[in-house]
Amino acid sequence: MADMKWAVAHIKSSFNNTIITVTDITGAETIAKSSGGMVVKAARDESSPYTAMQMAGQLADQLRDKGINGIHIRVRAPGGNKQRSPGPGAQAAIRAFARAGIRIGRIEDVTPVPHDGTRPKGGRRV
């Protein structure tokens, strides 16, 4: 247990795509990266839970080859004045990492939330 080597998995999940980037614990060096378009060719499948599971499985293999056996997860939705809930791929990716035998430390939500930023798109509602 003392020889745990940790990394950080940044999962950006929207309703159009899911991007997973794995960095070292400081976030400076990228260890592995995958997006929906690298796994499936149809644009409609990029954000699906199945694609996210495939991506996480591939990344787990790469991490094991590099000697990393634990990850902290940071989930991010589009945020800002867009949607604040992550897409369908986020939860599937987390489950796939756990099933692949990678130990999960922390899971945190890092979606950017505006402190009364720009006006949201769409008409006025009365």
Swiss-Prot record:
Alphabetically sorted, this entry's keywords are: Ribonucleoprotein, Ribosomal protein, RNA-binding, rRNA-binding
What's an example Gene Ontology biological process for this entry? translation
First and last residue of the signal peptide: none
Protein name as catalogued: Small ribosomal subunit protein uS11
Give the protein family: Belongs to the universal ribosomal protein uS11 family.
Write down the species. Answer: Methanosarcina mazei (strain ATCC BAA-159 / DSM 3647 / Goe1 / Go1 / JCM 11833 / OCM 88)
| Job description of the protein | Located on the platform of the 30S subunit.
Q: Which Pfam families match?
A: Ribosomal_S11 (PF00411)
Q: Name one GO molecular function term.
A: rRNA binding
S-S bridge residues: none
Bilayer-crossing residues are none
Q: Tell me, how does this one assemble?
A: Part of the 30S ribosomal subunit.
NCBIfam families found in the cross-reference section: arch_S11P (TIGR03628), PRK09607.1 (NF007176)
The taxonomic lineage of its organism, from the top, reads: Archaea, Methanobacteriati, Methanobacteriota, Stenosarchaea group, Methanomicrobia
Q: Give the GO cellular component terms, alphabetically.
A: ribonucleoprotein complex; ribosome
Give the source's domain of life in one word.
Archaea
